[in-house]
Amino acid sequence: MKDMYLTPHFSLEEFTRSSTASAKGIDNSLNPSRADHRQVIENIKNLCEQGLEPLRQHFGQPVVISSGYRCPTLNRAVGGAKTSQHMTGEAADIRVPDNATGMKWFAWMMEHLEFDQLIKERATKASPTFWIHVSLNANGRQRQHVICNLIKNQTS
C-alpha cells in the first residue's frame, strides 16, 4: 500500500512508516481490505484533509510525519499513552523544519484549524527543537485543547 495517496500530498505509507517498528520487527501496516483497518484509514484521511493538507497548502512547504498510525504493540514500544489517538489514526506528530517555521505553523493551526489536541512537544527540557502533535476526533467533537510546551521525558 506504499502508493495509496489519501490526499494530494499525503500517502498511507507516511503514516505507517516507523523506524522503531522496523528495528523491533513490529508489523505496523494497514490493509484497506481488512474491515478493522478501514476505519483507521478513514480517520487518517480525515486528519489529512482537515488538518495537514490545509497546513501544507497554506505555507507551501512539505509537512513531514514523524509519527502517525501506531498499532498497539508499537504504541507500547514507544511509550505512548494507553489511550493514544495514534492507535486510531486520529493523531500525527509532524517534524518542523526549524523553530521559527514551527512557531508559525503552530500559531496558524491554533487560529485556523478545528482540532482535538494541538501540542508543541519536545523530548527533554534541554532539547532545542520541538515537533507538533495534532489530533482530530473521528466523532467530530473537537476540544481545541492546546498545550504549548509539553516535555516528553521529564527525567532528562
Model-derived segments and spans:
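Extended, low-complexity, intrinsically disordered C-terminal regulatory tails
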Residues: 49-79
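Extracytoplasmic cell-surface/polysaccharide-interacting catalytic and binding patches
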Residues: 1-56, 150-156
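Short, polar loop/linker segments at the starts of domains and inter-domain junctions
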Residues: 29-30, 80, 145
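Glycine-rich, flexible loop/turn motifs
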Residues: 6-8, 74, 83, 114
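Catalytic cores and adjacent binding grooves of peptidoglycan-active enzymes
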Residues: 83, 88, 96-156
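Short connector loops at helix/strand junctions that flank enzyme active sites
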Residues: 58-60, 87-91
